[in-house]
């Protein structure tokens, strides 16, 4: 009897439950996958959005919407008046920022709303556009797919290929808040009817544009950051006279498989010295000249070692020239000598530019491929 009464109560409760209420149809939802911002000539914020379209009657798979506003929060209301459907938050994949905007202002203040709303996606990738943001957003993608998906896949595949960095919105915020490192962002540009990852954008401590790195320099940046999640590809032009070959054939390509770094920092009479010793294990991917590897492998190791040091030294000097620290050297200084770090914390970029940085790699070839 008790079981029967309990069953009746359960069925009565189920009958009174209203369920999910009004049905939600995907055709009426608008998922914003890409935000893009730049400043116009009047210093107004121009915002572009790419949202997916699921209607069977639509000819395009996504819609680009443009608004001119003072703040990103204000753009939400204007978007709602232009997009037919409900704007669903939490699906953002990419945030594009015009380089011209970074050259004028700290963009973090404009992105403030994205950090405050818990519904927003803070794992979206932050990308700098070298050129017109409008050109990128209105590029024809009929043979490539939906714009938001194309940008996300391009950025993540180039990072996996280790020729650019990958900075999420959350990571960008952390870099901006940490005085021991300066931000580095993926850089992209439009070439004819293609989107190309051209390298990495470096920012000052105040969030303004400092300089750009090409793809080779971006790979070296990952080495100096000790970011070894995947093999890092590098191609070097080695001294032709050492290997008795022509200049146009004196190339070798490698993958850095492992790297173990030892950082030491010291202050002497207020002058900072950073010593970096790095053991690097590589595999030979390409060699365009003849060489007896059994007898001359050490010669090749030394040549690659010297070229790696030369290019890393040039990259460090480039960062020092612009008073930026995308490598995170400041993190090591802070952890090893906190007392002296507090003296330079507020002007770390300038302090690094005046410091002596010694980079000493030790290269070992662990694989030469099946052809040897």
Set out the residue ranges of the language-model regions.
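Membrane-proximal alpha-helical signals and transmembrane carboxylates
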Residues: 2-372
